[in-house]
From Swiss-Prot:
InterPro entries: MATE_fam, MATE_MdtK, MdtK-like, Multidrug-R_MdtK. Residues 1-10, 74-92, 148-159, 210-242, 297-313, 371-386, 439-457 are cytoplasmic. GO terms for molecular function: antiporter activity; xenobiotic transmembrane transporter activity. Pfam families: MatE. The chain crosses the membrane at residues 11-31, 53-73, 93-113, 127-147, 160-180, 189-209, 243-263, 276-296, 314-334, 350-370, 387-407, 418-438. Multidrug efflux pump that functions probably as a Na(+)/drug antiporter. This is Multidrug resistance protein MdtK. The gene is mdtK. It is found in: Cell inner membrane. The keyword Cytoplasm does not apply. Residues 32-52, 114-126, 181-188, 264-275, 335-349, 408-417 are periplasmic. GO terms for biological process: sodium ion transport; xenobiotic transmembrane transport. One of its GO terms (cellular component) is plasma membrane. It is a multi-pass membrane protein.
Amino acid sequence: MQKYISEARLLLALAIPVILAQIAQTAMGFVDTVMAGGYSATDMAAVAIGTSIWLPAILFGHGLLLALTPVIAQLNGSGRRERIAHQVRQGFWLAGFVSVLIMLVLWNAGYIIRSMENIDPALADKAVGYLRALLWGAPGYLFFQVARNQCEGLAKTKPGMVMGFIGLLVNIPVNYIFIYGHFGMPELGGVGCGVATAAVYWVMFLAMVSYIKRARSMRDIRNEKGTAKPDPAVMKRLIQLGLPIALALFFEVTLFAVVALLVSPLGIVDVAGHQIALNFSSLMFVLPMSLAAAVTIRVGYRLGQGSTLDAQTAARTGLMVGVCMATLTAIFTVSLREQIALLYNDNPEVVTLAAHLMLLAAVYQISDSIQVIGSGILRGYKDTRSIFYITFTAYWVLGLPSGYILALTDLVVEPMGPAGFWIGFIIGLTSAAIMMMLRMRFLQRMPSAIILQRASR
């Protein structure tokens, strides 16, 4: 029992800074929306449209680079720290190549925006302008993620938290300068949010690099002198590990986007209630997601040390802590769901629907926690391909079709509206949790030699 308590303390020490970093990142998006809304409703809508395209694109690159964390954790645990610098340098090369692709996609996203039905031309122009300003921050964001993954792979999660809050503090005044045109800068409105956010990502990257160069704990990890050339073998391995994670993230983000589109014809009350419940459940999701990042680090580190039993302990502890957290957040959600909904909107119909949907959200919080921590465990074992297959099957084969049938058709029951989609979420997330656990048990029952061989690839 003592080993589980000790492991839980280590996991929470790693996870809490990740939680705070995620809060800072979420707050940046909130600040952009509020400050753009203060300028005009059109500018706020433009930022919202631009963000809906930016997020799937940049999260694809983010997911690809998440492969670095278990790789570095495993090298650190096995005492092969001299190989870490080369992996990081190749991560920077990969981030550079991916950022070019993302920038090309975002530059041409205007065709998608302008093809939207009944969109106001002025709104479309502002959304395109916002994206074309923001895309210059894509390399800065991805380079920052490489540096952050280096730190987190070495079990240093506090730097990412500090840089997140630095970014938030810089974002507010820079937003103000470019939105309203102060200190000789042009008045750009919502487009100024894109300029500010792009600049902030570069500031965060440079601040993180400055920390890494000065950190005593990383003195033995230095990038090669001069410019290291791309190493196709290392980059191929990072892509093999990272691409399934990237695709899983992409399909998860697009699932919620598709559901939002399917809900939109149902009316303002249904859309508002759905959005409130989704926004709140997304805030609660930060807790298990951050714990999953910590579990990846611990499992990778223990496998690097050659201890499959300690890796199992880290995995089980992460799941137990995650279930306890999810139980508490579910009780909190059920108890205060109406009061929470009132913070967003005071329309009685909207509040009633949002409170009902939050009840369904409370039901799936334990499943959601298990599936996301299970994903973190599998990343630690470098078993990322199964994450993609499980996520795709659970969300797009089981969750979305069942939600569609319940919400919009009378094949099973009378059309349930948004609640049908939320029952679909429960089906999808519970299926994902079950499949993640089955895969984890399958891996852990392999002979230790095979597990360690797979982890050292």
